[in-house]
Amino acid sequence: MNVISVLSDSDFAGCKDTAKSTSGHIVLLNGGPIAYYSGRQTTVALCTAMAETIALAKLVVKIKYLRALLHDLNFCQTRETNVDSTIVWVDNTAALAVATGNDYTHETLKHVTVKVRFLQECVQRKIVRLSYINTHKNISDMMTKQSSGPQFKAHRDFVMGYTDIVVSHSASASFAVRVRRRTVRLRV
């Protein structure tokens, strides 16, 4: 069973010079990180929903590429429920509403219509399934914002492979995390 999960986040107007937002995500394959990204967005977002939507659109392009690559390597995504959607965890309910097409309209999102339509198509075709995650549990927060020392250390240890985080998905799309300390032995 190969399960691809992604945690996505964006800050809002984090750059003091340009007012551009920073996007970040961590891609997990069977609970272990295989890719991560943190970078400045190319356009200025007018609200947090727009910043998160821009981040999601860029992320879904990467997910489609990774799924094709993993398929070529015989790491097809399968689950016991026969749903092969990649689960993307997002901590912004407005961005979820925009991407899933749940009658959310906002004047400031008009000029990202193409990205919104792309996201909605990927959700409808079940390439991705978007789910909400509390911002305090979102590991990709470390890619976009400063965090407290203990929280940063826990997220850093996971990304660097010092701890395992087991991601479990229930039918209600809840997110559970179990952290297990990994022992690393080096031979010299």
PLM regions: where:
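RNase H-like nuclease fold core
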Residues: 3-49
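RNase H-like nuclease module associated with reverse transcription
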Residues: 3, 42-188
